[in-house]
Regions:
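Bacterial Sec-dependent N-terminal signal peptides
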Residues: 1-33
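Sequence-level preference for short, compositionally simple segments enriched
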Residues: 31-335
Length: 335
């Protein structure tokens, strides 16, 4: 007959307790919620978007969707790098609004203040947003980012990005981003950054005489910003807008089959007072229509593509080797 001492019994009890706790934690992690609801009126799981994000599983192996009920969510939101495979889904962009009012002078973090002014910052890969408005309502006070995206494989569908200067910071040297059926407005350089980004069927709205894009495409990248089947519009009285200027030496921006209003300047592009960048940037156009699309007076260092050259500006080639089918995020288009 085996007789345990008090010490042995205590040790066995402790081991059993530790084993039970370990199994409980495994079960808890295996059963994490993949659908979370946010509602201002308290009818959901959380009343704050950030609180909902902070309570999701880190590095989940299954996609997590946060459903956001209609309301104005006045908060600064950050999707951390460990919040991958996350979707934020609103009811519709007209009444599901995330807004904040940080700007360069308010943040006061020296020369890098711009990058801290975001309303929504996305760092987690495989991110998706639908039916949302993301707004920086600081006004015309200088740099004030509404949406900042550093993540790879980020998708925005039926969203509005509202602001003035630097509305959308599409950043990340290795970031690939897709925007479909979105509305993006601003004043100066309101779409800027280093990402490879495709804008499909979007409305790009200029609120003042200035510049739409300021790409900082890394050297060696085949694509930077590509606007496909987009509409370029402007506020009343706005009639002197450039398609873009190079934030860095190897900026790449292309407008393909877009409708351009009369606010687009005849020369189209600006060198940002750096003539040497005319040799290294790639600013391209093909098949555009409207009064702003005439290429007769375009700067000589821009590129009017042939039909053959324009064919490479399709989703497969832009995002290669973006694993589109497995992501179930974006339909693959073929020539």
């Amino acid at each position: 007959m085996l007789i345990m001492t008090g010490l042995e019994l205590k040790n066995n009890t402790m081991r059993l307790l530790i084993t039970c706790l370990f199994l409980w934690h495994l079960a808890a992690f295996a059963q994490y919620k993949t659908e979370i609801y946010v509602a201002k009126d308290g009818s959901g799981d959380f009343t704050s978007i950030q609180e909902a994000i902070d309570n999701t599983k880190s590095f989940p192996d299954k996609p997590i969707t946060i459903f956001i009920k209609a309301g104005v969510y006045q908060e600064k939101v950050k999707v951390h790098a460990w919040n991958n495979n996350l979707t934020l889904k609103g009811e519709n962009p007209e009444n599901t609004i995330i807004r904040w009012d940080d700007h360069f002078k308010k943040i006061n973090r020296a020369r890098n203040s711009t990058f801290h002014t975001y309303t929504l910052l996305v760092q987690g890969d495989n991110f998706r947003a639908e039916n949302l408005t993301i707004e920086n309502f600081a006004g015309e006070v200088g740099q004030a980012v509404a949406l900042s995206v550093e993540a790879d494989r980020a998708v925005f569908v039926n969203c509005r990005m509202l602001g003035n200067q630097d509305t959308l910071y599409a950043d990340g040297a290795n970031s690939r981003q897709y925007y479909e059926d979105c509305y993006i407005e601003g004043t100066t350089d309101f779409i800027f950054g280093a990402a490879t980004a495709l804008f499909k069927n979007c409305v790009i709205h200029s609120k003042s005489n200035s510049f739409i894009t300021a790409a900082s495409t890394p050297e060696g990248r085949n694509f930077g910003f590509v606007f496909l089947d987009c509409e370029l519009t402007a506020a009343p009285g706005v009639d002197k807008v450039y398609l873009g200027r190079p934030w860095r030496d190897f900026a790449k921006t292309a407008f393909i089959n877009c409708e351009m209003g009369p606010h687009i300047r005849p020369e189209g592009w600006d060198n940002w007072s750096s003539p040497e960048r005319e040799k290294t940037t790639l600013y391209a156009e093909f098949g555009n229509t409207g009064p702003g699309a005439s290429n007769e007076k375009r700067v000589p260092w821009s590129h009017q593509l042939s039909k053959k050259q324009a064919k490479k500006y399709n989703m497969d080639k832009i995002f290669e080797p973006f694993l589109l089918p497995s992501m179930n995020l974006i339909p693959v288009e073929n020539d």
